From Swiss-Prot:
Protein's name in the database: Small ribosomal subunit protein uS4
Organism of origin: Chlorobium chlorochromatii (strain CaD3)
MF terms in GO: rRNA binding; structural constituent of ribosome
Task of the protein: One of the primary rRNA binding proteins, it binds directly to 16S rRNA where it nucleates assembly of the body of the 30S subunit.
Record-stated family: Belongs to the universal ribosomal protein uS4 family.
GN (gene name): rpsD
Length: 203
């Protein structure tokens, strides 16, 4: 699948949110949009622009292009419950997101590579599809030949226990994680407003 290959730091500055760890320091130094007039941009933002910005935040955060993101929205609409909540929960269930949340990679992009390169198994079977939707009680583990990779070990060592969400149980020694349950929206601390995205697609 095609992926965004531009400057993630420029996009982060434009959207006002760190989309990757390396973008955090740039936002601290330059917390304004890129470009010659980035610091001086003022004026009221239209409702459509706000909705579009929130959609872009979600797409870039989870590393998803428009067609797939719209498909997630359609699935969210078809499910019972609040559409916005359903959308976020679907994105959180992606295998690459779980690998990231468990601390096996410092970024979702890195987690996506680990999955697509065939390093990860789900319930004992190799899964190389980053968008694979994990279900409660599923066990994610690195293949035997992939265990103890320096990138994974370093990430686990640098990931504090407080960063690992309550809905994922991680066994660092065996590089294994169990998806305990689908999180509630209130438990997902991300800087976007999915309701604006729902309003955008509902037009």
């Amino acid at each position: 699948m095609a992926r965004f290959r531009g400057s993630i730091t420029k996009v982060s500055r434009r959207l006002g949110i760190a989309l990757a760890p390396k973008a955090e320091k740039y936002l601290e130094r330059r917390p304004f949009p890129p470009g010659q007039h980035g610091q001086g941009r003022k004026g009221k933002i239209s409702e459509y622009a706000l909705q579009l910005r929130e959609k872009q935040k979600m797409k870039y955060l989870y590393g998803i292009l428009e067609k797939q993101f719209r498909n997630y929205y359609k699935k969210a609409v078809a499910q019972r419950g609040v559409t916005g909540d359903n959308l976020v929960k679907l994105l959180e269930r992606r295998l690459d997101n779980i690998v990231f949340r468990a601390g096996f990679s410092p970024s979702r992009a890195g987690a996506r590579q680990l999955v697509s390169h065939g390093h990860v198994t789900v319930n004992g079977k190799k899964v190389d599809i980053p968008s694979y939707l994990v279900s409660p009680a599923d066990v994610m583990e690195f293949r035997q030949k992939s265990k103890n990779m320096s990138a994974v070990t370093d990430s686990l060592n640098k990931t504090p226990e407080s960063r690992i969400p309550a809905w994922i149980q991680v066994d660092k020694a065996h590089q294994k994680a169990v998806f305990l349950s689908v999180p509630e929206r209130a438990d997902i601390q991300e800087e976007f407003n999915e309701q604006l995205v729902v309003e955008l697609y509902s037009k």
